[in-house]
């Protein structure tokens, strides 16, 4: 497994900081995963423990993994845009990863995120995306989530005691979503302290089961 820094360029001309962790040479490449971090106005960046655990784990399961800082975070250019411009940031990450995967083998590109990053990722619906992985998404009943009616697969990981969107509230929001799996992390709240490695394993297992199934 190798790790490199990278620069993403958004369609509106911003340069974003990123890291890429590639699949070890002795592991078959399955595809790639984008990881979007929690809310930048509350200290979120690409080094958050949940994001970092996924960044370390997923390459061992066959997925090149990219984490990045949203616009206005650390050395990424621009300023926070309340989720709108940040969708362009995720799209730039998908564009970057498309050069790492083999389209002829139908390698997959998944959009993943935690908290704010999950909510942003769920509204990036471009054709190159294979599906979505949303960890503790802070969804509300009036949220307009672009992927909700999309037939591509979705994994929603929700902490049992999430302060913003607990399992029962999530069910009321996503009850009519297509092709959606839900996984509850017992004894965890929104911040998932002590549960980051468990979350990473759940994501890796879900992706592996999709391939084997």
Regions found by a protein language model. Give the residues of each.
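Short alpha-helix in the alpha/beta-hydrolase fold that links the catalytic acid
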Residues: 165-175
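Catalytic histidine-centered segment of alpha/beta-hydrolase-like enzymes
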Residues: 188-200
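Primarily recognizes the serine-hydrolase "nucleophile elbow" in alpha/beta-hydrolase
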Residues: 88-152
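Short beta-strand/loop motif that positions the catalytic acidic residue
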Residues: 150-151, 156-158, 162
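Acidic catalytic loop of the alpha/beta-hydrolase fold
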Residues: 160-165, 190-191
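Serine-hydrolase catalytic machinery in alpha/beta-hydrolase-like enzymes
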Residues: 15-104
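A domain-start/cap signature at the N-terminus of enzymes
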Residues: 1-9
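Catalytic histidine neighborhood in serine/cysteine hydrolases
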Residues: 176-191
């Amino acid at each position: 497994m190798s790790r490199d820094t990278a620069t993403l360029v958004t369609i509106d001309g911003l340069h974003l900081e990123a890291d890429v962790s590639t699949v070890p040479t002795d592991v078959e490449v399955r595809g790639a995963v984008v990881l979007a971090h929690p809310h930048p106005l509350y200290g979120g960046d690409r080094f958050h423990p949940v994001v970092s655990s996924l960044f370390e784990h997923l390459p061992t399961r066959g997925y090149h993994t990219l984490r990045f800082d949203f616009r206005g975070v650390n050395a990424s250019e621009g300023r926070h845009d309340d989720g709108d411009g940040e969708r362009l940031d995720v799209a730039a990450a998908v564009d970057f990863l498309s050069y790492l995967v083999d389209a002829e083998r139908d390698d997959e590109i998944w959009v993943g995120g935690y908290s704010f990053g999950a909510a942003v990722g769920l509204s990036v619906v471009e054709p190159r995306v294979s599906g979505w992985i949303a960890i503790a998404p802070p969804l509300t009943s009036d949220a307009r989530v672009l992927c909700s009616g999309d037939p591509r697969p979705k994994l929603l990981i929700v902490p049992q005691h999430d302060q913003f969107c607990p399992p029962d509230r999530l069910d009321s929001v996503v009850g009519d979503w297509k092709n959606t799996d839900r996984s509850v992390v017992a004894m965890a709240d929104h911040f998932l302290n002590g549960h980051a490695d468990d979350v990473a394993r759940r994501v890796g297992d879900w992706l592996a089961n999709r391939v084997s199934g």
